Amino acid sequence: MPSRRAIVPRPLPGIEAWVTRRILLAGLLLALSLPAPQATTAQSAAAARPLPRLRVSDNHRFLVTEKDDPFFWLGDTAWEIFHRLDREGAERYLQNRAKLGFTVVQAVALAEFDGLHTPNAYGATPLHSDDPTQPNEAYFTHVDWIVRRANALGLYVGFLPTWGDKWNIKRGAGPEIFNANNAEQYGAWLGRRYKDDGVIWILGGDRPVETDAQRGILAAMARGLKAGDGGAHLITLHPSGGQGSASWVHDEPWLDFNMRQNGHGAEFTGRYDQLAVDYARTPIKPVLDGEPIYEDHPIAFDAAKFGHSVAADVRRALYWDLFSGAFGHTYGHHSVWQFWDATRTPVNNPLLPWTGAIDQPGAQQMHHGRTLLESRPFLTRVPADDVIVADRVPTSVPGAGRYRFVATRDTDRTYAMVYAPVGRPFAVHMAAVAGREVRASWFNPRTGAATAIGTFPSDADRTFTPPEAGELLDWILVLDDAAKGYRMPGQGR
């Protein structure tokens, strides 16, 4: 495009020229004194650069961007955001999650809480006549805004086309509205609509796959999504509690990575130990926990017996999953997923309104796991519980129940990390790190602070005692090959 030249008025004779110059100067000074116009939220969202496309890494263990940069999935369950929040509320929530270092928010188009018949904040329901082939433009215009605003803030949307009660009404409001034909049409419509946005498709919605017909519905919806977006976005499946997508659809070509719902118990055994089972499956696919125990949730759905979870419970789930091979992690808060406030019927006893819950300690501590792992080689990380020396009483170390120790390292053995969920002494095989000398540090998962311990030879096992004892005082031991010169844990590369 040719450059534009400023239009300069010709000088006028006498007083007219003087007046004109004064007017022009005054206008210039006024323009310089005014603040630059601020784009509206909608304009900012529309003008934002697209988020990088994501793909599965070459070793099939992680997600990377189109430039092969590692992508750390730090998700949050915002299941009802499209259905319950207006734009002001959504803006408050999204700003908070972006500030806290989250990278994904998980949200449902056809929502759980009577999502077909109870309208959104602007009075719109998602479908005409409960027909997936007749989406309501007014409803999805609001979905558009939230998706694009999230993207503008650097957040991908883990987009569930529907909650599971619309294809398997094992429980919930339903009704069941999907068959293979309309599921494919609905998927294609969504794919076309969001093909250029930063979304990750999540099928399922907290229900098991129990029949061939249900399996066919999911496959048809995935086929429609891929046809609509041209295969631009990854696809996974959110399973029912205590299960993983791998149990039903691991071999399906449309499934790019596995998702587990380890759920709302606080024990390692029987839930969190199952991530390693999915990690070991072939063909190899990345895996993460898309719904672990929520903060402030009734533990095992039985608050009278076990009480409500606290930040320590959600931290344990984070490191149990990551160190067992997950490529990322999803956090959740019991008030936030349902966006509960005093105007709504509470589901399973939330403790405080969502506007306060978004700043609970667990939410603020999740990003420490991200910064820790991003400060070391990322795409070569593997589970490595064999770093830990079993105690004479193995239920102490590596432990059991809420107090299970787990470890990870990279394949080149330049570093190793051990998560200690309780402040008790434990021993490690120093030879797990390849260097002759090993630099040891403590990383505090509650604050993100790192403290040097010292440098030690790698030719013998060594016992380490966490800086503080106590069952809610968890620690991470970081062992580095001293020759690599890595920065302190959590301080970047």
Language model regions located:
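N-terminal secretory signal peptides that target proteins for export/translocation
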Residues: 1-20
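Active-site mouth of glycoside hydrolases
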Residues: 49-51, 55-269
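Extracellular glycoside hydrolase catalytic/binding regions
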Residues: 192, 199, 205-358
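Bacterial N-terminal signal peptides
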Residues: 22-35
